A protein has these predicted regions:
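Outer-membrane beta-barrel proteins
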Residues: 3, 53, 62, 152-154
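Short extracytoplasmic/periplasmic juxtamembrane "stem" segments immediately C-terminal to an N-terminal membrane anchor
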Residues: 33-54
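Helix-loop-helix
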Residues: 1-40, 74, 164-169, 183-198, ...
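Soluble non-transmembrane domains of integral membrane proteins
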Residues: 66-311
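Intrinsic low-complexity, intrinsically disordered segments
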Residues: 47-73
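A long-range scaffold signal marking pre-active-site subdomains of enzyme folds
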Residues: 25-28, 46, 85
Length: 574
């Protein structure tokens, strides 16, 4: 690698390391004491409400509705979701994937409303089953002969969507007309083997009515967000591959407060809460319509609802998101339609990406060869002027570059132009649920690391395992560096730095998904092939002849903007 190419790679590495550090999960987790305290406070609130209504809490039975994708269990105490099982998915250990699991947990979902001047929490009420089919149920709590409240759940076929309605009858006689409040608390259960990596993708998303989708920080130990000036359409407790979302269909959520905190336990990674206001009951029969999304974070499925739920999938910002949305996902889905192995799909995706980037690779390689040809003359100029006159040194460099028709940063710029595509795939592949628990060769799960060696101790910057796919990627990068150094003649610190950078990638990517490392590995292999192909048609002798021919051409008057800028920088250094 020549100096300018190395500078370009260093620039990419610095961005990559900074990105990784910014999104690195914080290991200083909040202890379970905070969660316990919150649970006690919540129970105290329920007791206060219960004393107003005189309703006794008891352990009730579960009523189920299901389709081929999920099973929803609803408790007749509170008429609330007790369990949501995704039938087509499994946890990393092969056990049932419970997206909502209220066993041994303080999960809760309820409404607080005014009934005859008293504050009532619905999670303390006993509900009676009024009607039930395979896909819908109606539960009712009767306050008296003239007043009751119905909870209706209905589940469509082939869908993760659950329609939910709360209908009040005769509860509009309150003089205060207080807003109805909704509360939802959920302990987020770890579904993946790499808990810390999953935690870094777990957060709360929300969509204001008149603003873009937003979210809480994934890396903070504890976050509270109050939205007292914005009406919100939906709120979602989002994990890496799954989401539990509530969407307000006929009103909007007001005066929202959302909280989340890291939990240090063997099974729970975060605790999330939502509280919000709804309009008060002001007519004899008032219905609040919602729907839940309990399902996978699949871009196509979420986009179908046309309310921005797909924004939860972290595809990157600005141009990165556009590249992923319009190019990467479209081509990925096209290959997926042929029912290929996902490892093969990643390889084919890599081939297409490298072909698209081939003009930049070609330009970078040609520029590198040009700088190699000019190296003896560059060294001669440096030996003549050295550090005595930096301005004169830069002027002589510019004369040489101009006469030879060479851009000294020609090898660096193409590398920088590749950054959006490189980072687009860096965001897409770890978020692609299609890779979850899909095998390829020795890799059991392309969505997580392939730990071929598990260490009995923690190695700083590496972890407690060695990923074979990451190791192969690192070796291929070292080979690529060695081959380039042989032709570029780079020496000294630049040569050493070229070998250090792949080792940094080993530490950074060792805990990243095997699918991502598979992409980088084959990207290196294809680059080898491309450079071998380029060498067939380009030689240093040909480049040298073109440079000499360019020197013989009459020089154009005036200086280029690039040359003027370099000379200005040289003057500033004096």
């Amino acid at each position: 690698m020549d100096k300018n190419t190395t500078i370009g790679i260093i620039f990419i590495v610095l961005i990559f390391v900074g990105w990784s550090m910014f999104f690195q999960p914080n290991n200083n987790n909040t202890s379970t004491n905070s969660n316990t305290e919150q649970s006690l406070n919540h129970n105290q609130e329920k007791n206060n409400l219960e004393s107003n209504t005189g309703t006794r809490i008891k352990h009730g039975s579960l009523i189920s509705i299901e389709n081929n994708l999920l099973k929803l269990d609803i408790s007749d105490v509170g008429a609330k979701p007790y369990s949501v099982i995704l039938k087509a998915q499994k946890r990393y250990d092969g056990t049932t994937l419970n997206l909502i699991d209220s066993r041994n947990s303080n999960n809760n979902f309820y409404f607080s409303l005014d009934v005859n001047g008293k504050k009532v929490a619905t999670d303390t009420l006993d509900f009676e089953l009024i009607s039930k089919t395979d896909s819908a149920i109606v539960l009712r709590h009767q306050f008296n002969s003239n007043q009751h409240i119905d909870f209706t759940y209905s589940l469509s076929k082939e869908s993760y969507k659950i329609d939910f309605a709360v209908t009040t009858y005769g509860l509009n006689n309150s003089s205060s007309q207080l807003p109805v409040k909704i509360y939802w608390t959920n302990n987020i259960r770890a579904q993946e083997e790499n808990r810390e990596y999953e935690r870094s993708y777990t957060t709360t998303y929300y969509k204001p009515i008149n603003a873009d989708t937003d979210y809480l920080s994934e890396t903070s130990d504890q976050v509270t967000k109050k939205l007292d000036k914005e009406d919100v359409k939906w709120v979602s407790f989002k994990q890496r591959f799954f989401s539990a979302s509530i969407i307000n269909e006929n009103y909007s959520f007001k005066n929202i407060e959302i909280k989340q905190e890291n939990i240090d336990s063997s099974d729970i990674i975060k605790h999330m809460t939502l509280s919000a206001d709804l309009p008060g009951v002001n007519i004899p029969q008032q219905t609040y319509k919602f729907w839940f999304y309990f399902g996978i974070n699949n871009y196509k499925i979420l986009e179908h609802f046309n309310i921005g739920l797909e924004d939860q999938i972290p595809l990157g910002w600005g141009p990165l998101r556009w590249i992923n949305k319009w190019a990467v996902i479209s081509f990925f889905n096209l290959l997926d339609s042929y029912h290929l192995n996902y490892g093969i799909i990643i390889i084919l995706l890599t081939v297409v990406v490298r072909l698209v980037l081939f003009p930049l690779t070609y330009s970078s390689y040609v520029s590198q060869v040009k700088m190699q040809v000019l190296k003896p003359e560059i060294d001669a100029i440096k030996a003549k002027f050295g550090d005595k006159d930096q301005q004169k040194l830069q002027q002589e460099y510019m004369k040489l570059y101009k006469s030879a028709g060479v851009n000294p940063f020609g090898g660096c710029i193409p590398l920088i132009l590749q950054i959006p595509i490189v980072f687009a795939l860096f965001r897409f592949l770890p978020s692609a649920i299609e890779l979850r628990q899909k095998s390829f060769l020795w890799v059991d799960d392309l969505s997580t690391y392939d730990a071929v060696i598990k260490l009995p101790f923690n190695v700083p910057f590496v972890g407690e395992h060695i990923s074979l796919m990451c190791l192969l990627m690192t070796i291929s990068t070292l080979i690529y560096t060695w081959l380039n150094n042989r032709t570029s003649g780079v020496t000294g610190q630049m040569r050493i730095l070229g070998y250090i950078m792949p080792l940094l990638f080993l530490g950074i990517l060792n805990s990243f998904p095997a699918g991502l490392n598979l992409y980088y590995l084959f990207s290196n292999i294809i680059t080898f092939a491309q450079q071998a192909f380029i060498r067939i048609f380009i030689s240093q002798d040909d480049i040298h002849k073109k440079i000499q021919d360019h020197k013989k051409k009459p020089s154009k008057k005036g200086k280029s903007l690039f040359q003027k800028k370099l000379e200005e920088l040289a003057k500033q250094r004096r």
